[in-house]
């Protein structure tokens, strides 16, 4: 069962201890989950954009951002401020309503998906029992926003970019879902908290990446394609489509696409860490750590250390994958659209289906090792 802390219950009890009624405590709590999610997402984007600019500069033997803060750490904030004050332009022949709704439909599902990510053993906003199903459902909304943006712009490059984005997203959504289903089958749960808890038995050796190496690779490749990262950035290929479905956008509407892309990258990396790399789990069993400290596993000192370091472990694993994604972007060439679709439908889909069937067979044959 869930080992995460019910933040709503703890927050409500704290406010009730100050003399507030349960109803008032609940009303105060209502906006806080989204505020926490937005804060975490924005911080993740700022760090990722800074890393992207510095790593790309290192790959190309440049210095990169240097003047906006120490080592250019404030450059992402300067970029965001610039986009914020730019004029919001809607093309004359564009469909204004759809043109405005498109970026919103791209960004909102990605932000909502953060609600199901456990950042640590005692840091979980919403332990939804069907968290994985909710995430897959939300991610299926994004192609609608991309296609809507391309169509509403009344621009041939935008339309082609939107069509490419929708085709790419649909093509890679299916193998990604099949890869996740194999993990769900082993964990006997759709809850992200339960999936992490199932991997914390023997430290590093109990991580799902060892039992699902093929699923791990399929998920990571599909996640890069869903985030439209090189070598899969066909929808916005500058040499072919100017900027794809983003061509006619400026100011904050363009910034919403920018935010959605980077928030999705950080989210995908966090989900890889949760599903395959043990989430907040230590590389060593917690019992060993408690033994070295001369404490029991349930001792307050051990609980504080494991809770604090668990958050760091989750973020560290995620940003290791973010670093890999950034490095791939600046060191690999773009694939053609036919190669991209062939990879999704003719290669990854059959392998993901085979991996799911093999996992089911192994679960029946070796129930202890595969979560029977």
Swiss-Prot record:
Pfam families: NADHdh (PF00146). PROSITE patterns: COMPLEX1_ND1_1, COMPLEX1_ND1_2. GO terms for cellular component: plasma membrane-derived thylakoid membrane. InterPro entries: NADH_UbQ_OxRdtase_su1/FPO, NADH_UbQ_OxRdtase_su1_CS. It comes from Prochlorococcus marinus (strain MIT 9303). One of its GO terms (molecular function) is quinone binding. This is NAD(P)H-quinone oxidoreductase subunit 1. GO terms for biological process: aerobic respiration; photosynthesis, light reaction.
